[in-house]
Swiss-Prot record:
Region (Disordered): 1-24
PROSITE patterns referenced in this protein's UniProt entry, alphabetically: ABC_TRANSPORTER_1, ABC_TRANSPORTER_2, PSTB
Encoding gene per record: pstB
Binding site for ATP: G68, P69, S70, G71, C72, G73, K74, S75
UniProt name for this protein: Phosphate import ATP-binding protein PstB
Organism: Burkholderia lata (strain ATCC 17760 / DSM 23089 / LMG 22485 / NCIMB 9086 / R18194 / 383)
Amino acid sequence: MNMAESHLNPVERTAAPAGTQEAAHGRPLEPLNAKIEVNNLNFFYNKFHALKNINLSIPEGKVTAFIGPSGCGKSTLLRTFNKMFALYPEQRAEGEIMMDGENLLTTKRDISLLRARIGMVFQKPTPFPMSIYDNIAFGVKMFEKLTRSEMDDRVEWALTKAALWNEVKDKLNQSGYGLSGGQQQRLCIARGIAIRPEVLLLDEPCSALDPISTGRIEELIAELKSDYTVVIVTHNMQQAARCSDFTAYMYLGELIEFGETEKIFIKPVRKETEDYITGRFG
């Protein structure tokens, strides 16, 4: 098996040690199987210290939401997981982001292979300037050699998982630009999962969508966690409460509190968290 295939047919990996995880400032959590472990993470835009000593465990097979005011660092943290910052020499990360025993910040793995394991969907729908079919097939072709029949099956599978197949199955050769905003975002999600990643990152995936499209995306997120570890950044606290199993509240580049979503929203430990959730922030 070559490196490009390894993420598609993963062997059993060593699970993170079981034990009690602690949220910011010592809040106890139940034992978790962490998919991603963030240890002493600091991030800089030139000299600006954007993330400050972040320690966090992302539970496997769950939806984790990052919330906080604009500029708090939640999107920056999300983008460190698949090294989006590597495109910009003035940006740097220090510390550890561990996944399956490997520090993603220092790995020698080809960055395209890393991003195949950790897919990402951005705030604004970004279909490629090609057909709906080719939008899905594009990434798959980078990592697998499939027959046309196999590719047809993969395209149908991904679009079905993204709850889009029934809406586009008769127009696969049409441009992705012809879809509505909500359909385009589901197309981007289908494109992200077509290469079968282990983790799916969603950066404000509903901010540009109408309420009906937002509802469909939220339903999709709930379904995806059965197959993927999902991390979502959102300004919408109600969305975080509806969609996530765990929530991290961030402020000024620091992780203030992390825990089970229900507890964070009903009985947070930190006053800063309570003030933000109840609208008394600032």
